[in-house]
């Protein structure tokens, strides 16, 4: 196919892998590094020309990665940033932090994306090559990862921050020889793949640790810390533990305690790599925002918060920070300020200025769904204590939610709950219908109209809300 636009790039990448060859969530045998290594060999190993910082964890890895890319580019080097998933735009997966750019992170030029795809296509023009030695085509994520390395190489990027997709040990990104390994907050997740025990999960995340390479880890539970220490000792890697930074005067655009913690971790790593993190460099990074991290828009006179929180701890923090997020509404963010959808925040600013001071007095609603392999029960148990209305919906696409399971487990959690605030449960497969039902809600237990609606549980859910 002819690749002449970024849309063509996406069509090429998504048309190259075989959907039938995607790894089964239940079949960990298909998670292996051999396919990625073989694919990169066909592409002349572009990853070997990059100095990479590898980031893994359960939550905060995207924010930490973005902060780190911005701080390193403050040292005058162009930095590539590979993250997943995207929320609004595929280009969020492959970004740039340019010391000469206006924003801390931005998209590459479309010509760069197109050139990288054309180069990739020239190496892989015979699709039969993509039936690799095990007879299975590369997965979508494996192709996206390989494309990132090709893009960075031909855009003359020398340093890249690489975020894992899932786990660490068998993640497609774990083909790199990193200069530093970063471990953010670790908790139970993906138990069907990574294991049901926090120690086992931590060991999987620690799989990114390379021999003799320094490791920077956020302090966790004693069990988590112990595993990290043992894995670093085994690999002969120096370990630097970082404390949670819950109070900070840094005027970060992303609000919440974890943002300060992620920023502090990124500064620690950057300084160890020889980057001068003075106030000038930090000030350049403070305005950085990412989609669906406490992001706000308006639906009529209601404030809608989009947040991709998908673990129990991140849901707890989101609930804690709802008021703070609303009181710090920003009219623009780095990535999406060009979108007409986001301009509604400015157009309707007057509508909610009177609401903000009284925000805690109004009923709150949450539209929630999560992927099948997430801790739905743990997250839902938090939400019933914090919201008056909960709307349960579904996620479509390759990564889906199990609506039947969610509804069944909802009843179990509600029956067992000793304490709850929720007064109304709405169930609908369509997120827009959930929103409409909340807006037209008539419930004797809820006297005032809902003024704050939170959409959370998955980045994929946030994406579906705005048609990403």
Feature annotation, model-predicted:
Residues 221-240, 339, 347, 380-452:
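C-terminal helical cap/extension that packs against the catalytic core
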Residues 1-57, 64-75, 82, 101, ...:
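Short functional linear segments
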Residues 119-166:
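Phosphate-binding/switch loop-helix module in NTP-utilizing enzymes
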Residues 156-158, 361, 448-450:
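Short, high-confidence coil segments that cap the C-terminus of an alpha-helix
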Residues 159-164, 171-182, 187-190, 200, ...:
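Nucleotide phosphate-binding/pyrophosphate-handling subdomain across enzymes
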Residues 66-123:
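N-terminal phosphate/diphosphate-binding loop that engages ATP/GTP or pyrophosphate donors
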Residues 458:
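Active-site-proximal loop/hinge segments that shape catalytic or ion-binding/gating pockets
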Residues 50, 127-133, 155-163, 178-280:
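Acidic, Mg2+-coordinating active-site environments of NTP-dependent enzymes
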């Amino acid at each position: 196919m002819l690749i002449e636009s970024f849309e063509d790039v996406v069509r090429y990448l998504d048309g190259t892998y075989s959907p039938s060859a995607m790894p089964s969530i239940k079949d960990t045998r298909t998670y292996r590094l051999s396919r990625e290594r073989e694919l990169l060999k066909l592409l002349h190993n572009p990853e070997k020309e990059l100095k990479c910082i590898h980031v893994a964890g359960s939550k905060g890895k995207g924010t930490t990665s973005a902060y780190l890319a911005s701080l390193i580019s403050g040292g005058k080097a162009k930095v590539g940033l590979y993250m997943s998933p995207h929320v609004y735009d595929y280009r969020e997966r492959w970004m740039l932090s340019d010391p000469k750019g206006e924003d801390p992170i931005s998209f590459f030029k479309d010509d760069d994306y197109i050139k990288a795809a054309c180069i990739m296509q020239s190496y892989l023009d015979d699709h039969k090559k993509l039936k690799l030695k095990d007879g299975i085509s590369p997965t979508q994520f494996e192709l996206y990862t390989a494309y990132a390395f090709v893009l960075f190489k031909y855009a003359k990027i020398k340093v890249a921050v690489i975020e894992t997709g899932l786990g660490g040990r068998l993640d497609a990104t774990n083909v790199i020889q990193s200069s530093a390994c970063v471990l953010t907050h670790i908790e139970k997740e993906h138990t069907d793949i990574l294991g049901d025990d926090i120690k086992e999960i931590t060991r999987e995340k620690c799989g990114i640790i390379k021999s003799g390479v320094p490791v920077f880890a956020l302090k966790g539970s004693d069990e988590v810390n112990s595993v990290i220490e043992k894995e670093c000792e085994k690999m002969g890697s120096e370990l630097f533990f970082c404390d949670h930074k819950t109070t900070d005067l840094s005027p970060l655009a992303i609000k919440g305690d974890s943002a300060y913690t992620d920023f502090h971790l990124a500064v620690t790593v950057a300084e160890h790599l020889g980057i001068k993190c003075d106030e000038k460099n930090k000030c350049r990074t403070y305005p950085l925002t990412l989609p669906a991290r406490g992001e706000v828009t308006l639906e009529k006179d209601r404030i809608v918060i989009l947040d991709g929180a998908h673990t129990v701890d991140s849901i707890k923090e989101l609930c804690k920070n709802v008021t703070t997020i609303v009181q710090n509404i920003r009219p623009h963010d780095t990535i999406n300020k060009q979108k007409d959808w986001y301009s509604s925040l400015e157009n309707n600013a007057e509508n909610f200025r009177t609401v903000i001071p009284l925000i805690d007095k109004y009923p709150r609603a949450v539209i929630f769904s999560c992927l099948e392999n997430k801790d739905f029960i743990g997250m839902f148990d938090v939400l019933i204590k914090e919201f008056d209305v909960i709307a349960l919906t579904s996620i479509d696409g390759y990564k889906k939610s199990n609506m039947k399971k969610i509804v069944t487990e909802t009843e179990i959690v509600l029956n067992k709950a000793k304490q709850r605030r929720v007064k109304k449960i709405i169930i609908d497969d369509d997120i827009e219908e959930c929103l409409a039902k909340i807006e037209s809600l008539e419930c004797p237990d809820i006297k005032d109209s809902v003024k704050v609606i939170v959409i959370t549980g998955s980045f994929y859910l946030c994406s579906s809300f705005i048609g990403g």
